[in-house]
């Protein structure tokens, strides 16, 4: 059913492009990919998006116009927000902005993740932090921390839309069975991702290499906080 609807949309788009091509002058732009905030509804999992709320009149009208032409967006409502209290403050965007951009991610155990982006890859380092000051039995503790980190790493990869090569530096473990269980856990967590992930292997130094397909630009490159929001 979903594929049928998608095919209808593509057929309509093709017919519209052919109609424009017959009457358009030379070097006329016939089609331009819609901005990210318009196509977001298709990229999210089913039922993940019920409403789009915006305080931009221009974006609101653009969304309304586009969604009228595409029946796949019928169940998504578009609302224009007119209150004097900004959406930025109402939904605590600063907090989520920091979570999506921050280099350091603190775990409940007291350990932390350090996420760094380079041109070649993304490197994620797992640090024990102050945990060792509280507990003993390092082997068991390191395994527990690595499990907690693996779950959060998979979540952060989805949240930040990190793609390409990803290197994860887990805390050193000696037990081979624990390493296998950790890899399996990471693979299972990555299966929650609608974008294809491939956990390659773990080296003797507890470095895990994985890849994630690139569907669109990472969140780091997408979000731009305007000066008006920053002042608020």
Each PLM stretch: what is its role?
Residues 10, 109-232:
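Conserved glycine-centered short motifs in functionally critical loops
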Residues 1-113, 118, 204-206, 211-214, ...:
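OB-fold/S1-family RNA-binding modules
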């Amino acid at each position: 059913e979903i594929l049928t609807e998608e095919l209808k949309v593509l057929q309509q788009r093709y017919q519209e492009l052919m109609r424009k091509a017959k009457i358009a002058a030379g070097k006329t732009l016939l089609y331009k990919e819609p901005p990210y905030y318009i196509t977001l509804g298709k990229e999210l999992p089913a039922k993940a998006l019920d409403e789009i709320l915006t305080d931009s009149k221009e974006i609101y009208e653009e969304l309304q116009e586009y969604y009228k032409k595409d029946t796949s967006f019928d169940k998504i409502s578009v609302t224009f927000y007119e209150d004097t209290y900004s959406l930025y403050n109402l939904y605590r965007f600063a907090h989520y902005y920091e979570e999506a951009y921050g280099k350091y991610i603190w775990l409940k155990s007291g350990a932390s993740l350090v996420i760094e982006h380079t041109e070649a890859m993304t490197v994620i380092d797992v640090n024990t932090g102050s945990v060792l000051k509280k507990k003993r039995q390092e082997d068991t503790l390191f395994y527990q921390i690595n499990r907690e980190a693996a779950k959060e790493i998979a979540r952060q990869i989805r949240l930040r839309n990190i793609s390409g090569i990803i290197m994860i530096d887990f805390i050193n473990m000696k037990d081979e069975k624990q390493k296998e269980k950790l890899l399996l856990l990471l693979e299972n967590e990555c299966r929650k991702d609608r974008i294809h992930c491939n956990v390659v292997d773990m080296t003797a130094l507890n470095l895990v290499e994985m890849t994630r397909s690139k569907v669109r630009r990472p969140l780091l490159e997408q979000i731009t906080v305007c000066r008006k929001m920053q002042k608020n």
